[in-house]
Amino acid sequence: MAMITRNTATRLPLVLQSHRAAAVSHLHTSLPALSPATTPTSYTRPGPPSTSAPPPGLSKTAEFVISKVDDLMNWARRGSIWPMTFGLACCAVEMMHTGAARYDLDRFGIIFRPSPRQSDCMIVAGTLTNKMAPALRKVYDQMPEPRWVISMGSCANGGGYYHYSYSVVRGCDRIVPVDIYVPGCPPTAEALLYGLLQLQKKINRRKDFLHWWNK
């Protein structure tokens, strides 16, 4: 009986080792190869949307007519800018110089008007104080659409020399939206004239009739 038990104890580790070797031999030693059909395709980033493409459902004839109407409206607007004089400080002297005979703004169709209801542009020239700010906004609200604002001089742009004063607005763009900034203290007449010409270019890029058509 002791002999049988001894033989069984010695053979058991050998049997376990043989079964383990057989199980390991059935394992895959290498990864299966991928077929060509399962290879991932390369990712292509889509391009940005085109801003010059016509709206969907708009024919070529309608697109041509709409663009010509916009061109006609922009031509009339940029050729008849009527500024509202809002001189507040020494920059107003240069604004008056620009409107005088030497530079002759009339040849550009720019005519100063005394009433905001007859104007489509406001030239804020000078230092805007906290007490004058409500009046500026009231005059701006009386102007018909479309309307534009030119900030003339360092004081109107950001407070200028009086930036840290308790009674000065640090930029008229805190009260009304500004389209053109003319730097300088004070700016020359040529600088204001250049700002008006830039405003004409900005008006020429408007697409009011197209936006109205797509509503």
Swiss-Prot record:
<feature type="compositionally biased region" description="Pro residues">
    <location>
        <begin position="46"/>
        <end position="57"/>
    </location>
</feature>
<feature type="region of interest" description="Disordered">
    <location>
        <begin position="32"/>
        <end position="58"/>
    </location>
</feature>
<dbReference type="InterPro" id="IPR006137">
    <property type="entry name" value="NADH_UbQ_OxRdtase-like_20kDa"/>
</dbReference>
<feature type="binding site">
    <location>
        <position position="185"/>
    </location>
    <ligand>
        <name>[4Fe-4S] cluster</name>
    </ligand>
</feature>
<keyword id="KW-0479">Metal-binding</keyword>
<dbReference type="GO" id="GO:0015990">
    <property type="term" value="P:electron transport coupled proton transport"/>
</dbReference>
<dbReference type="GO" id="GO:0008137">
    <property type="term" value="F:NADH dehydrogenase (ubiquinone) activity"/>
</dbReference>
<dbReference type="GO" id="GO:0046872">
    <property type="term" value="F:metal ion binding"/>
</dbReference>
<feature type="binding site">
    <location>
        <position position="91"/>
    </location>
    <ligand>
        <name>[4Fe-4S] cluster</name>
    </ligand>
</feature>
<keyword id="KW-0408">Iron</keyword>
<keyword id="KW-0249">Electron transport</keyword>
<keyword id="KW-0520">NAD</keyword>
<keyword id="KW-1278">Translocase</keyword>
<dbReference type="GO" id="GO:0048038">
    <property type="term" value="F:quinone binding"/>
</dbReference>
<dbReference type="GO" id="GO:0045271">
    <property type="term" value="C:respiratory chain complex I"/>
</dbReference>
<comment type="similarity">
    <text>Belongs to the complex I 20 kDa subunit family.</text>
</comment>
<keyword id="KW-0679">Respiratory chain</keyword>
<keyword id="KW-0809">Transit peptide</keyword>
<dbReference type="InterPro" id="IPR006138">
    <property type="entry name" value="NADH_UQ_OxRdtase_20Kd_su"/>
</dbReference>
<dbReference type="GO" id="GO:0009060">
    <property type="term" value="P:aerobic respiration"/>
</dbReference>
<comment type="subunit">
    <text>Complex I is composed of about 45 different subunits. This is a component of the iron-sulfur (IP) fragment of the enzyme.</text>
</comment>
<keyword id="KW-0496">Mitochondrion</keyword>
<keyword id="KW-0411">Iron-sulfur</keyword>
<dbReference type="GO" id="GO:0005739">
    <property type="term" value="C:mitochondrion"/>
</dbReference>
<protein>
    <recommendedName>
        <fullName>NADH dehydrogenase [ubiquinone] iron-sulfur protein 7, mitochondrial</fullName>
        <ecNumber>7.1.1.2</ecNumber>
    </recommendedName>
</protein>
<dbReference type="GO" id="GO:0032981">
    <property type="term" value="P:mitochondrial respiratory chain complex I assembly"/>
</dbReference>
<keyword id="KW-0813">Transport</keyword>
<dbReference type="GO" id="GO:0051539">
    <property type="term" value="F:4 iron, 4 sulfur cluster binding"/>
</dbReference>
<keyword id="KW-0560">Oxidoreductase</keyword>
<feature type="binding site">
    <location>
        <position position="90"/>
    </location>
    <ligand>
        <name>[4Fe-4S] cluster</name>
    </ligand>
</feature>
<feature type="binding site">
    <location>
        <position position="155"/>
    </location>
    <ligand>
        <name>[4Fe-4S] cluster</name>
    </ligand>
</feature>
<keyword id="KW-0830">Ubiquinone</keyword>
<dbReference type="Pfam" id="PF01058">
    <property type="entry name" value="Oxidored_q6"/>
</dbReference>
<keyword id="KW-0004">4Fe-4S</keyword>
<comment type="function">
    <text>Core subunit of the mitochondrial membrane respiratory chain NADH dehydrogenase (Complex I) that is believed to belong to the minimal assembly required for catalysis. Complex I functions in the transfer of electrons from NADH to the respiratory chain. The immediate electron acceptor for the enzyme is believed to be ubiquinone.</text>
</comment>
